[in-house]
Amino acid sequence: MKTLLLLGAGKSASYLIDYFADLAQKEACQFWIADLSVAHLEPILARKKGIKLIPLDSGNMTQRRDIIQNSDLVISMLPAFMHPEVARDCVDFGKHFFSASYESDAMRALKPEIESKGLFFLNECGLDPGIDHMSAMKIILEAKQKGEEIRSFKSYCGGLLAPQSEDNPWKYKFTWNPRNVVLAGQGTSRYMDQGELKLVPYHQLFRRVDEVSFVGLGKFDGYPNRDSLSYRSVYGLENIPTILRGTLRRQGFCRAWDVFVQLGMTDDSYQLSLPEHTTYRQFLNAFLPWDEAKSVEEKLADLIPDFDFPTFEKLQWLGFFESIPLPKTEGSPAQLLQHILEQNWALESEDQDMIVMQHQFEIQTEHGIKKITSSLVEIGKNERHTAMAKTVGLPLAIAVDLFLQQKINLRGLHLPVIPELFDPILKQLESFGIRFTETVIES
């Protein structure tokens, strides 16, 4: 019986944990779960056979390597920066490796050793990246097999609130790592538009948004991800005139978030040490010019040209115009902002999250241009069984299960962009209700 080791048991791992806990009950595997804190899993998994909970600081190399050495296959749901170390351990001990995170240069450097040892390493098999790759490649390969040419490909994804839980003006709460949300978009975004390279620096990013619509849900803002260009080779679209990968937020979010960007409140490059009783209002005012005759609100309106009422309402709801003491007074501006947002954007136990993803293709056929819009909407159940956890964890769990059943017989370093991987995974995802709806317009 194979021993599966899961490293990391955070919010995004709940469906994956349930999946393999069920397999362990059927004596299909031994399932070890290692995390800095496993106490939250004890009430859920207590008395279930075939499951072992292991308190582990994954930064402790000796302890981590010992556990990996005694397993057969490793699934990493750790922060992405730890994957190269875990992957190195897996290569050293001859263990297969699976993750939902982006494949790094450090991971690619291990490719010769992975291949020489006959191991299977699969990365980018979650939601974004993951389901986005698989669903897009299915359409891309079908078009190529017909001799059609893909002229434009845009893909957007967002982790948001279900409509019934949108109880604040931002229509947003944290459904994944808050720090990643606060720092999102820093750097320069690159994509292709009608054969031209487009560069979007951070200070313009949240002003350069596309309108993306979903049937029954309305309109969203889509802003470009940092790197769309590298996916030309991943998708076999090296000469495509237009390619863009982006992130979705509810309409109006980006305009309001841009206020924080323009003021410098998302800067993570330096540390502040503010007086102990500094308020939200004083924190905001620190980023505004001095003017004895004007209020914080007036100075903000002067500094931000398109500071409209919906944007004002969003900042007001967060408490930035009130004398509320800051939860933390030491840290970078981004860290202090994050602490404020965590108090306002925390998911409540009754909240439901939502995943939205949309691919937009323009394909040249022998008869003209065919436009395909392929959309996915997934609503979470509750605080533990979120749409994010479902769409991140299930593709990874299914891939591991297919590998254990020898329905995946590949070796080497892979992404789920080939039919041997994406066809069976997408088919299994449909059995869990994760499926895309397509509209096709031909002209």
Where do the model's predicted regions map?
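Hydrophobic/small residue at the entry helix of a nucleotide-binding pocket
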Residues: 12
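Rossmann-fold cofactor-recognition segment
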Residues: 48-60
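Helix N-cap at the beta1-alpha1 junction of Rossmann-like dinucleotide-binding domains, i.e.
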Residues: 36-40, 104
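ADP-ribose/adenylate-binding Rossmann-like module
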Residues: 89-107
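Conserved Rossmann-fold cofactor-binding substructure of NAD(P)-dependent oxidoreductases
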Residues: 58-70
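C-terminal catalytic/substrate-binding lobe primarily of soluble NAD(P)-dependent oxidoreductases
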Residues: 145-443
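Rossmann-fold NAD(P)-binding glycine/threonine-rich loop
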Residues: 101-123
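Oxidoreductase and adenylate-handling cofactor-binding alpha/beta cores
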Residues: 132-150
